């Protein structure tokens, strides 16, 4: 849907600020929102222009975020976070995976609270890693506790920080997604490459579940 990024709409339904807007989900969501008549802005470490999208620079590590970014914003969609599959999970990388999600949410909340910004909603990404990686016949629901492993703890801290937006009387939503697949994405390309060569490798033990969700869902 990226061809819709420059599409105009005669009626603006609302204004949305997205963190992590340059990622797979962020790009697709931006196109969808624009096509539905929303104004979209991005928070990014780089202030590159992205079609009709306003891009504002921020730096969660240094606590840099101009409160003027929130002028006219109705909703925040928080997708920012270091890619969990991009590098080895060294001690430093694990710290980065957590802080890129948690500290960025802390900064958003601080600026919203300190400047009495009136939002209609805060939507935070999360992941099914909340439930752990062990194969199980159990059908998980929102009532299940987080797993006592790295991903479970990461998602728990991530969601706890998102829940703090409830303190500002803002409706808060957390979405636990599986691996998101889209035909042009690098993750999908890695899965398809051996298949195109006539090789069909077994993932893991071959017995574990491999949950996924398509980008359109």
Predicted regions and their residues:
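N-terminal Rossmann NAD(P)H-binding glycine-rich loop of SDR-like oxidoreductase domains
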Residues: 14-36
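NAD(P)-dependent short-chain dehydrogenase/reductase
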Residues: 165-174, 178-211
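A conserved structural motif in NAD(P)-dependent oxidoreductases
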Residues: 211-217
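Conserved Rossmann-fold NAD(P)-dependent oxidoreductase catalytic core, especially the SDR/UDP-sugar
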Residues: 105-149
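NAD(P)H-binding glycine-rich loop region in Rossmannoid oxidoreductase-like domains
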Residues: 48-49, 54-107
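Rossmann-fold scaffold of SDR-type NAD(P)-dependent oxidoreductases
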Residues: 19, 73-79, 124-125, 176
